Amino acid sequence: VNIREYEKIKTKKYMKNLNLFIVVVHIFSLMFFTIVGKFDYEGDYVLQNVSGLTSLATTVTMSFTTIYVVYLMNKNFIIRYIGKSRERMYLYPSGRDEIFKNKLFTSLSFLSKSFLSIVIIVNILFLFSSRIINISFTGGLIYNLVDILSKSILALIVSFTMITLSNLFGIKLQSTNVALITSVGLVALLGNIVAGTYSISTIYIGLICALMYLSNYLISRYLLSYIFNLDIMNDNKL
C-alpha cells in the first residue's frame, strides 16, 4: 500500500462520521429557515424562496463543517506537526512536505466528495418539494439547478480556504487551539460570502469561486513550503 492509499484509509476512519454530520446540519438548517420564513409576517424575500433558503442553509452547513473538519484534522494529524511530535514526522523517508501534502489533500478530497454530494442532493430535493411546502422559486428548473451547483462549489472552496488558513496559523503558532479558534474567526468573517450570493448572477458567483480558488492555491503553496523549510532544531523560527 503506497502512502496515498494509506492516507485514504486513515482519512476514512477519522472522518467516518462526517457524512452524517453534514446531512443532519444541512437538513436541520433548511427546516429551521423554512419554518422561520413561514412565521415571518414582514415577508422577508430571502426566507420565502428556494434560492435564499438554500443559500442560508448551505452557509450554516459550510460553517459548522469547516470547524468540525479543523477539529478532526487537529486531533488526527496537525498535532503531529506541533512541538516535539514533529521531529518524528520529519524522519519519515518520503519527506516532511510530501507526507503533509498527502494528509492535507486526502482530507480535503474526502470533504469535497461528502460536502458536494450531500448538499447538492438535499438542495435539489428541497427544490422539487418546494411546491408541496409552498415555497416559491424564480427562473426555470435548469437555472435553479445551476444556482444550487455553483453555490455549493463556492461554499466548498471557501471552506477549503478557511481550513488551510486555520492549519497554517495552528502550525506556525504551534497550537491546535489556535487552529480551531482561527477557524471560528474565519467563519465569522467569510461565512457571509455564500449567504450573500442568493441575489447575484451565476457569472459573478463563478468569478468569486475563481478568486477564492486562487487564494486557496497560494495559501496551500505557502503552507507546504513552510512545512518543507521548517527548521525543527529552532522552535522560534517563523
Predicted regions, residues:
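Aromatic- and glycine-rich beta-strand/loop motifs that create alpha-glucan
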Residues: 1-23
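Secretory targeting signals
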Residues: 28-66, 105-167
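Transmembrane alpha-helical segments in integral membrane proteins
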Residues: 65-81, 156-178
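Helix-loop-helix units of permease transmembrane domains in multi-pass membrane transporters
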Residues: 76-108
